From Swiss-Prot:
Binding-site residues for Mg(2+), renumbered to this chain: D248, E274, E301
Source organism of the structure: Xanthomonas campestris pv. campestris (strain ATCC 33913 / DSM 3586 / NCPPB 528 / LMG 568 / P 25)
Assembly and binders: Homodimer.
EC number(s) reported in the record: 4.2.1.68
Name by which UniProt lists this protein: L-fuconate dehydratase
Function as written in the Swiss-Prot or TrEMBL entry: Plays a role in the catabolism of L-fucose. Catalyzes the dehydration of L-fuconate to 2-keto-3-deoxy-L-fuconate by the abstraction of the 2-proton to generate an enediolate intermediate that is stabilized by the magnesium ion. L-fuconate is the preferred substrate with 15-fold lower activity observed for L-galactonate and 8-fold lower activity with D-arabinonate. No activity detected with D-fuconate. Can also catalyze the epimerization of L-talonate and D-ribonate, but at slow rates.
Highest classification ranks of the organism: Bacteria, Pseudomonadati, Pseudomonadota, Gammaproteobacteria, Lysobacterales
The UniProt record lists the keyword Cell wall biogenesis/degradation: no
Cofactor stoichiometry and binding remark: Binds 1 Mg(2+) ion per subunit.
Domain of life: Bacteria
Length: 441
């Protein structure tokens, strides 16, 4: 019998703030980081499962400690039993009678639980010798719904409704898989649009994005309206009228200012405004959507669980949503969110602006195409061109599209050398960086 013998964690941080990669109106100096987890087993060929929580620097130690605190809940479990019932494994963590007090199902502990759940899915896909998107897409509708906790959802999506959606898609799975492998999945890029970039860098990267085949770019906005008008004008001139341009305020505004600000940017034919206000403010998003029609409104990367997504959809507060592979309770909760979006007919544009997020969320979007909606040409996965070299199975982008992963698992495994180099504070990079700072002082 194979057994989980250890839960291993690493606080991994990359100095992205040095070049202002990832900078936006609320987060001007992010150091992209990961609370990285490995589920070690005594299975053959060093079988293991990998997962992570994305953070932006300070606090990553807190997030890593939360992941480590889950060791007693998973070490000693049978690998085969975990794989056979990933729904029960997830509920073992999310429904713990004492851990729930730290949420319930939100915040640092919920993200930690999500990382461990994702590592279990990675383990299952590796054991099946399949990339995760294919592993999910080849589960039966009954197996898929068994992974989902429908508590708090039944007023919007029942188990029977979810089964009907999945069963309706089942006859097309083989054809959709072939299409995905042949064509890839559409991507959009945020790489030109970080707020700290110079105008020259913005224009250069926007033109490069179009040349690389991207049909949508996204700019960060929200710090200064005149700067945003200038940057949007430069970007629109660089990409031309036929390329879509979205903007992202990263929760910077109250409701009234969001409406006023977006009315001033409307001339640039905005594809959507992302995170205009607090991710918890369902009614605020609804008011903004009403106030800036026809500009679409989006949120989701900080939406903390399936319940808030349900409310956003029920309230008609959004035109599209972002899912995030590492924000909610793992694959299980993201499957619930994808099915909710399908029920309400709302498009999903997954969030991937962070270390490892492109690698992870591509699997969820592709599984959605094959097993749930059959749609991808009216949506896209975010792409940022940072830090992929640190992963054993990095994303592959060709002509503005994600190519379907072929390597078994969730694409979450990092190179051991990268972990050794960038572990905080004892990795070689950070030791040398601290020494250099002391020398300058």
């Amino acid at each position: 019998m194979r057994t989980i013998i250890a839960l291993e964690t690493h606080d991994v941080r990359f100095p992205t703030s040095r070049e202002l990669d990832g900078s936006d109106a609320m987060n001007p100096d992010p150091d992209y980081s990961a609370a990285y987890v490995v589920l070690r087993t005594d299975g053959a060929e060093d079988l293991a499962g990998y997962g992570l929580v994305f953070t932006i620097g300070r606090g990553n130690d807190v997030q890593t400690a939360a992941v480590a605190a889950l060791a007693e809940h998973v070490v000693g479990l049978s690998v085969d039993k975990v794989i056979a019932d990933l729904g029960a494994f997830a509920r073992r963590l999310t429904n713990d009678s004492q851990l729930r007090w730290l949420g319930p199902e939100k915040g640092v502990m919920h993200m930690a639980i999500g990382a461990v759940i994702n590592a279990a899915w990675d383990l299952a896909a590796r054991a099946a010798n399949k990339p995760l998107w294919r592993f999910i897409a080849e589960l039966t509708p009954e197996q898929l719904v068994d992974t989902i906790d429908f508590r708090y959802l039944s007023d919007a999506l029942t188990r029977d409704e979810a089964l009907a959606i999945l069963r309706d898609a089942q006859p097309q799975r083989a054809a959709r898989t072939a299409t995905l492998i042949e064509q890839g999945y559409p991507a959009y890029t945020t790489s030109p649009g970080w707020l700290g970039y110079s105008d020259e860098k913005l224009v250069r990267l926007a033109k490069e994005a179009v040349a690389d085949g991207f049909r949508t770019i996204k700019l960060k906005v929200g710090a200064n309206v005149q700067d945003d008008i200038r940057r949007c004008r430069l970007a629109r001139a660089a990409i031309g009228p036929d390329i879509a341009m979205a903007v992202d305020a990263n929760q910077r505004w109250d409701v009234g200012p969001a409406i006023d600000w977006m009315r001033q940017l409307a001339e640039f034919d905005i594809a959507w405004i992302e995170e205009p206000t607090s991710p918890d403010d369902v009614l605020g998003h609804a008011a903004i959507r009403q106030g800036i029609t026809p500009v679409p409104v989006s949120t989701g990367e900080h939406t903390q669980n399936r319940v808030v997504f349900k409310q956003l959809l029920q309230a008609g507060a959004v035109d599209l949503i972002q899912i995030d592979a590492a924000r909610v309770g793992g694959v299980n909760e993201n499957l619930a969110i994808l099915l909710l979006a399908a029920k309400f007919g709302v498009r999903v544009f997954p969030h991937a602006g962070g270390v490892g997020l492109c690698e992870l969320v591509q699997h969820l979007a592709m599984a959605d195409f094959v097993a749930i909606t059959g749609k991808m040409e009216d949506r896209a996965i975010e792409f940022v061109d940072h830090l992929h070299q640190h992963f054993l199975d990095p994303v592959r982008i060709q002509h503005g599209r994600y190519l379907a992963p072929e390597v078994p698992g969730f694409s979450a495994e990092m190179h051991p050398a990268s972990i050794a180099e960038f572990s905080y504070p004892d990795g070689r990079f950070w030791v040398e960086d601290l020494a250099a700072s002391k020398a300058k002082a």
